[in-house]
């Protein structure tokens, strides 16, 4: 009886162990299935960031059709095709990212400029990315104007957000009278700065710097550092003078308006050239200028913000400008993307250099993509 009892007990223990083991295996399988489901449904911020960057690159290139491919089904239904052909995006900088539930919100500073007149806008652009089935799509966009710079008479003025009042940045009379061309390596011959008119302007992403170009037959490029506290100091000074005063005094005060342009850095003077646009790098360490010149065509120059010096990479020396045009494409965080385009299609002598290139903004070395 004892042996029989022991056998039954042993069998019971074995059966119990088998049941427990099976239960554990089933539980592990369910957990793995649940983990797999959670992984497939989780939100990948890196993938969403890539969508945001690619979308902005398409907008910069004005490739509207490809940019629409990133819209969600609902957003695609509400798109409006109208656009300002003169006001273009020349750069953007991702300033903030946040994951909210199963979505990502990306905030960018976007620099826009008019290519036909001196007007620039610095906007905060917000993009919401959601996962639609297995793809990451843009479900919502918002744009808030941070700053505008524009021409009024011979002045460049600044408007903050929706303020009615504006502040003087600089007037054309305050521009330097003479400057050196970066082509003059001896720095001997100063050239008269063109003061016929302002041609183009553009903001840095922080809004503290404004790239300015003036032109007649030559083009002058400068960077003005903006200090908005000067406007507050100016207003306080006027308040301290007390009330009263007639219209002549008011006109005199207006004429003495203190500019918020704190200092100006001469960047370059391009002989017989026209500036097509200017754009700051995302890190705000460099300024890229695209210009055109008779007999040369389109070309780029990249300057350091600190001091306005040319970088060591000279596009004019690296490429045969009698055969190719050099045009700006886009920025990555520490690189400049540009295109080398043949002037004559089918020119087989330059196939090794035409195409897409990338310039490092750290060591200023270029490579073909």
Residue ranges and their predicted role:
Residues 199-210, 277-287, 326-337:
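Blade-terminus and WD-like Trp-Asp/Gly-His loop motifs, strongest in beta-propeller folds
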Residues 159-172, 211-217, 288-295, 337-344:
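Beta-strand C-termini and the immediately following turn/loop, strongest in propeller blades
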Residues 191-195, 266-273, 315-322:
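Surface loop/turn motifs at the tips and blade-to-blade linkers of beta-strand repeat domains
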Residues 167-180, 217-233, 295-304, 344-363:
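Structural motif
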Residues 24-27:
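C-terminal motif of bacterial Sec signal peptides marking the signal peptidase cleavage site
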Residues 121-191, 257-262, 357-369:
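Short beta-strand edge/turn micro-motifs at domain boundaries
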Residues 43-44, 50-53, 57-107, 295-296, ...:
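Short solvent-exposed beta->alpha transition segments
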Residues 29-32:
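Bacterial signal peptide processing site
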């Amino acid at each position: 009886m004892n042996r029989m009892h022991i056998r039954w007990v042993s069998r019971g223990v074995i059966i119990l162990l088998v049941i427990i083991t099976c239960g554990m295996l089933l539980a592990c399988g369910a957990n793995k299935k649940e983990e797999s489901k959670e992984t497939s449904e989780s939100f990948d911020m890196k993938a969403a960031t890539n969508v945001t960057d690619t979308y902005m690159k398409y907008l910069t290139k004005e490739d509207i059709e490809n940019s629409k491919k990133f819209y969600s089904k609902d957003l695609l239904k509400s798109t409006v095709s109208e656009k300002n052909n003169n006001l273009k995006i020349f750069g953007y900088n991702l300033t903030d990212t946040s994951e909210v539930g199963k979505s990502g919100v990306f905030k960018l500073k976007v620099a826009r400029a008019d290519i036909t007149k001196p007007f620039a806008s610095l906007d905060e652009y917000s993009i919401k990315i959601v996962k639609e089935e297995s793809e990451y799509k843009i479900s919502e966009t918002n744009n808030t104007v941070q700053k505008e710079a524009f021409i009024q008479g011979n002045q460049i003025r600044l408007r903050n957000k929706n303020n009615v009042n504006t502040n003087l940045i600089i007037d054309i009379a305050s521009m330097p009278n003479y400057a050196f061309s970066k082509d003059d390596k001896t720095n001997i011959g100063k050239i008269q700065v063109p003061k016929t008119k302002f041609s183009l302007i553009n903001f840095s992403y922080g809004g503290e710097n404004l790239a300015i170009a003036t032109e007649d037959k030559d083009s002058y490029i400068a960077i003005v550092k903006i200090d908005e506290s000067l406007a507050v100091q100016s207003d306080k000074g006027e308040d301290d003078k007390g009330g009263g005063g007639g219209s002549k005094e008011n006109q005199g005060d207006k004429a003495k308006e203190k500019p918020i342009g704190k200092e100006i850095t001469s960047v370059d003077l391009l002989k017989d050239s026209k500036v097509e646009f200017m754009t700051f790098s995302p890190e705000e360490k460099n300024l890229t200028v695209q210009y055109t010149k008779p007999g040369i065509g389109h070309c780029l120059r990249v300057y350091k913000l600190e001091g306005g010096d040319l970088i060591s990479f000279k596009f004019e020396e690296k490429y045969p400008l009698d055969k190719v045009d050099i045009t700006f494409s886009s920025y990555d965080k520490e690189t400049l993307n540009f295109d080398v385009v043949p002037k004559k299609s089918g020119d087989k002598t330059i196939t090794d250099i035409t195409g897409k290139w990338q310039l490092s903004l750290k060591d200023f070395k270029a490579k073909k993509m």
